[in-house]
From Swiss-Prot:
Protein name per UniProt: TPR repeat-containing protein YpiA
Domain of life assignment: Bacteria
InterPro entries for the chain: CellSynth/LPSAsmb/PSIAsmb, TPR-like_helical_dom_sf, TPR_rpt
A Pfam family per the record: TPR_8
Record-linked PANTHER family: TPR REPEAT-CONTAINING PROTEIN PA4667 (PTHR45586), TPR REPEAT-CONTAINING PROTEIN YPIA (PTHR45586:SF15)
Keyword terms: Repeat, TPR repeat
Keyword Repeat: yes
Gene3D superfamilies: Tetratricopeptide repeat domain
Complexes and interactors: Interacts with the RNA polymerase core.
TPR repeat placement: 33-66, 67-100, 135-168, 171-204, 238-271, 272-305, 306-339, 340-373, 374-407
Length: 423
């Protein structure tokens, strides 16, 4: 190997990449063709793809039958988005050439990038028919299916790859296998592979995947351990806070669940789901005022956040704060938000506030959506009876009785009303 190339390598290894590239550039004119190929590979590894292409393009013209050079040239062209040119270069390699399977892999990669998954799959199977036990081909098939969301298929090929290698192209095979199993709903099967992946490469994404999957598998303590470790490693990894909070909740640690959700809000202040979850935990442990405040903040982020609205309305209803129910619904309606349950809440609130005309209008509007809801029908019928509207209440009571099957008190009420009308 040329001494200037050796010097350039030493400079880059010492962290002086710019000097290394300059030294390599100075060496170009005195390099033999074999060393030019080495220099091109170094340029590529050090991030100067254009210089790598300049050298390899000339070498490819000089040695068109050197198919390893051809594949490398195509790989460089793919890197600069010259996909059609790369494909044309790859198609010059004959099927009988030892480098042909590699060219098929590169073609498959190209077609996958273009969204032509079936063509990509065909190229990979063609390569596999030549080299049946090559882990790189199995891994490429796994990656193809993984990219398509066909996780069960991906599992098959990642498992085969994992028997031979734990890493390919800088990708941890055990992590990919674990992710595929988890995405397939095979949470328990994913756990041992996540354990291996975290041992080999404890990066935040792998730890998160492990913790999240452990929670899905019901291994709550493992989930808490992994997600807590991740929080310590990178507290700004916002996705960890919801599953960690839910893990604490599953252990009955509601205070810790609330605390964790609020920590998450500090890093992800526009996450309405975290506000809602924190509110539910606050309400669960009797912190009603804090719960209401968190729900109001969730609604400030999204006035149409239905679950937060329903939760806050339920709190107001439990606290018999009927004015707040009316004010909240009127406010969200002013934003153009609507939900069938609003009329039911309004009907109940107006009834309690003795605003009977408004209550009747709200019941009538709600009936369009809740005519098959037993609790609504009973409440509506009770309101009508209180208002002396027995004739209107009667069909509702009969419907409730039909749903209940047997209800002596209800039967007596119906008979009494029918008797009054028969006189």
């Amino acid at each position: 190997m040329n001494t200037l190339i050796q010097e350039a390598i030493k400079l880059v290894e010492a962290g002086e990449t710019e000097k290394g590239l300059n030294t390599l550039s100075k060496a170009e004119k005195q390099l033999h063709d074999e060393d030019k190929a080495i220099a091109a590979q170094l340029y590529y590894e050090w991030g100067d793809v254009e210089k790598a292409i300049s050298l390899i393009s000339d070498l490819h013209d000089l040695y068109p039958n050197e198919t390893e050079l051809t594949n490398f040239y195509a790989e460089l062209l793919i890197d600069i988005d010259e996909e059609e040119k790369a494909l044309a270069v790859l198609e010059t390699i004959p099927e009988t050439d030892p480098s042909y399977p590699e060219s098929l892999l590169l073609m498959a990669d190209l077609y996958q990038m273009q969204g032509l998954f079936e063509v990509s799959e065909q190229k990979l199977f063609q390569a596999k028919s030549i080299l049946d036990n090559e882990p790189v081909i199995d891994f490429a098939l796994g990656e193809l299916y993984f990219a398509q969301g066909a996780y069960a298929k991906a599992v098959q090929y990642f498992k085969t790859t994992a028997e031979e290698q734990s890493e390919i192209g800088g990708v941890n095979v055990h992590q990919r296998l674990a992710e595929s199993l988890s995405a397939s709903g095979e949470f328990e099967d994913a756990i041992p592979w996540y354990e291996k992946a975290v041992d080999e490469n404890p990066d935040p994404n792998t730890i998160f995947g492990y913790g999240f999957t452990a929670l899905q598998a019901g291994l709550v303590k493992t989930a808490i351990k992994q997600l807590s470790d991740l929080k310590e490693l990178d507290p700004s990894y916002t996705s960890l806070y919801m599953p960690l909070s839910k893990s604490y909740e599953a252990e009955g640690m509601y205070e810790e669940a609330l605390k964790t959700a609020k920590e998450g809000i500090r890093y992800d202040e526009y996450n309405k789901e975290l506000f809602l979850y924190a509110a539910k935990m606050a309400l669960k442990i009797g912190k009603s005022e804090e719960g209401k405040k968190l729900l109001q903040e969730a609604l400030a982020l999204d006035p149409g956040f239905v679950e937060a609205l329903h939760t806050l309305l339920a709190v107001y209803h439990k606290e018999e704060d009927y004015d707040q129910i009316i004010d909240l619904i009127q406010e969200v309606r002013s934003y153009g938000e609507e939900d069938p349950k609003y009329n039911w809440y309004l009907a109940s609130a107006y009834t309690e506030l003795e605003q009977y005309e408004e209550a009747k209008q709200s019941f009538e509007a709600a009936y369009l959506h809740y005519r098959e809801d037993r609790d609504f029908l009973y409440e509506y019928a009770s309101f009508l009876l209180e208002e002396g509207l027995q004739k209107e209440a009667l069909p509702l009571l009969k419907k409730v009785l039909e749903m209940d099957g047997a209800n002596e008190e209800l039967e007596e009420t119906i008979l009494r009303i029918e008797d009054e009308f028969s006189r």
